Amino acid sequence: MIACLSPNGQNLNGGDAAPTRLLVATLRGINLLERSEPGAAWTDRGRVLDGHHCGSIMVEPKRGGIFAGMHSGGLYFSGDGGFTWEKRGEGITIGQVFSVGYAHHGDKVALYAGTEPASMFRSDDYGKSWVEQPGVKETTGRDKWSFPSPPHQAHVKTMTIDPRDPNVIYAGVEQGDLLKTIDGGARWRVLDDYSKPADWTYRDIHLVV
């Protein structure tokens, strides 16, 4: 099993056993660690994508691909467990990818990438090409979304797909709102039952599970 860790953004791991490979996202790339079996000592296998600020890593279990979202670097793909990478972001017109997710539609795999400024992109060919889903930008209340640090732009920090229905996705905007789509990302609505009207500035959503 491969496990992923990052200082920012979202991680999706592959498998349910104790990991023997660990991908650790950093401000200067991804560090690889391996061990022969659970409980054994970890061995440093070096760093890949050196110089890239990696904020999010995902292992897609059906085909085993790994996707990494970069701050100011777009999206990268690995097909060999994280040792070599290629850029896969054609169609992603926003360079900062904060979150990545997948949905299984039978044998098909839909991939999602959340960005800054806050938007959502979808791929139906395993990351080779992407199409922006305009619904996030059309969400009511978007004008209140912001972020404390310059350039004060909100981002899609986290997302999760309903295991019962791959068209149902929840996304958290930092700082903004909790969003839901029931059509695979085309249209989104705000979920605000959990908060009070005066609390909108505190909707600093880091994780949706």
Please give the residue ranges for each predicted region.
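Extracellular glycan-interacting surfaces
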Residues: 1-209
